[in-house]
């Protein structure tokens, strides 16, 4: 495995270079702006390329040493892509709403996750002695908990790295990461504040094609990290008679 490749052409085709209208900009983004066209800021992709490459390396390195990456993107056009990318790279995600204290009050979140597991257990057991009305109430509770916490139910603790789409919308997540010393990789559009972002990636954070490209690259970098971690253990995973259980699945089985 190796870090995923990408080209300037791919970034252009995905519209990564299109910022917001010039009057909506954050002046702190000035170093990353190439210019403007028809009152739209154009992001300097000559800076995006090395900064994106650096972020991919950080993701791979984090996973290679056994770390966990949390994908965060709750805006409509990012929600599904965030979940799919995190799942296929065996990582974690928040794609519905960031609950205040999700990282800084992990104990309370853990209790809610335990409640989700318990409700799951009740609903999956036959003849549990609950009436139809009670089961309906439990199903609604499970749906609500799953929507909020489904992407982190197997995380087992705060993550080692966070990847964020839209730093304006996910301001609370960034504040919590900063308080806990969790490094942040984030897309910074022309209307964003790049301060407190450890690994900023200048680029459009609204276009679906751009979001898909970022998430695909981050997911592939995480998969590269998994391969490196397995390689470092000296095991030939493919030659094993029994495939290893992924940590997330192991946690679920033991819950």
From Swiss-Prot:
PROSITE patterns membership: RIBOSOMAL_S2_1, RIBOSOMAL_S2_2
Sorted UniProt keywords: Ribonucleoprotein, Ribosomal protein
One of the record's GO cellular component terms: cytosolic small ribosomal subunit
Gene3D superfamilies associated with the record: Glucose-6-phosphate isomerase like protein, domain 1 (3.40.50.10490), Helix hairpin bin (1.10.287.610)
Molecular functions (GO terms): structural constituent of ribosome
InterPro entries named in the record: Ribosomal_uS2, Ribosomal_uS2_bac/mit/plastid, Ribosomal_uS2_CS, Ribosomal_uS2_flav_dom_sf
One GO process term, biological-process aspect: translation
Region: Disordered, residue numbers: 232-255
Family: Belongs to the universal ribosomal protein uS2 family.
Name of protein: Small ribosomal subunit protein uS2
Species this protein is from: Agrobacterium fabrum (strain C58 / ATCC 33970)
Gene for this chain: rpsB
């Amino acid at each position: 495995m190796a870090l995923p490749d990408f080209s300037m052409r791919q970034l252009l085709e995905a519209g990564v270079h299109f910022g917001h209208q010039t009057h909506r900009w954050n002046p702190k983004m000035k170093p990353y702006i190439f210019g403007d066209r028809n009152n739209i800021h154009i992001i300097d992709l000559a800076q995006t390329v090395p900064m994106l490459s650096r972020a991919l390396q950080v993701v791979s390195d984090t996973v290679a040493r056994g770390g966990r990456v949390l994908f965060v993107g709750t805006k409509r056009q990012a929600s599904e892509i965030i979940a799919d990318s995190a799942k296929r790279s065996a990582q974690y995600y928040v794609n519905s709403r960031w609950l205040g204290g999700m990282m800084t009050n992990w104990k309370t979140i853990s209790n809610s996750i335990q409640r989700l597991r318990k409700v799951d257990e009740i609903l999956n057991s036959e003849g549990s002695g609950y009436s139809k009305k009670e089961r309906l109430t439990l199903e609604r509770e499970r749906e609500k908990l799953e929507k909020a916490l489904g992407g982190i139910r197997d995380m087992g603790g705060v993550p080692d790295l966070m990847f964020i789409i839209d730093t304006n919308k996910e301001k609370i997540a960034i504040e919590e990461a900063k308080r806990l010393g969790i490094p942040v990789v984030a897309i910074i559009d022309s209307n964003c504040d790049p301060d407190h972002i450890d690994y900023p990636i200048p680029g459009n954070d609204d276009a679906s094609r751009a979001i898909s490209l970022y998430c695909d690259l981050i997911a592939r970098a995480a998969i590269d990290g998994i391969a490196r971690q397995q390689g470092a253990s000296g095991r030939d995973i493919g030659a094993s008679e029994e495939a290893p259980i992924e940590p997330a699945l192991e946690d679920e089985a033991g819950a």
